[in-house]
Regions:
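Conserved alpha/beta catalytic core and glycan-binding cleft of carbohydrate-active enzymes
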Residues: 1-159, 165
Length: 167
């Protein structure tokens, strides 16, 4: 049985991150180069809808087509943490550049690529902040933060961190 379902059923007020929504928007955690909805790939809509309603039962969500969770696990949307990236994975900009070919296509102008990146970032964050769940944004995502070659904070050398210890 899904651990999120057990926690939410037994402990009122306990929340969990929604991997269904994250992966439905940007692609699977296990493959940085595979895109999903933000890359224009169809098939992840139910996972995104499940995230937007806050992982609760909803008549317009077909649970058989949701990525991981096959039944609602939240009893209230505030138990659902909506996000597309966090500290233990690529930040959103880096993930988009790795999984959306048009963002690195040098035959397109830099202005076009930047505008497209901004549109995709806005679309992703719109899903997060307008969902019924609790929105979570990695610091700097609103400014198109990048970690460049380091996929997680734990892989980044201390010398490359600011004096506050953040990236």
């Amino acid at each position: 049985m899904n651990g999120k379902y057990i926690l939410s059923a037994l402990m009122n007020g306990i929340g969990a991150f929604s991997d269904d929504m994250r992966d439905g928007l940007r692609g699977p955690f296990s493959d940085d180069t595979k895109g999903a909805f933000l890359a224009g790939i169809a098939g992840e809509e139910e996972s995104i809808k499940f995230g937007i309603v806050g992982s609760i039962a909803h008549p317009q969500v077909d649970m058989t087509r949701v990525n991981y969770d096959k039944k609602p696990w939240a009893t209230h949307p505030t138990q659902h943490i909506s996000y597309v990236s966090c500290l233990d994975d690529m930040c959103l900009v880096d993930r988009l550049k790795a999984s959306v070919p048009s963002l690195t296509d040098t035959s397109k102008s830099k202005d076009y690529r930047t505008a497209e990146l901004i549109r995709l970032d806005l679309l992703a964050q719109t899903a997060v902040v307008t969902s019924q769940g609790v929105p979570f944004m990695l610091a700097g995502e609103e400014m198109l933060r990048t970690r460049r070659v380091f996929t997680t904070v734990s892989h980044r050398p201390t010398a490359s961190m600011s004096s506050t210890g953040t990236t």
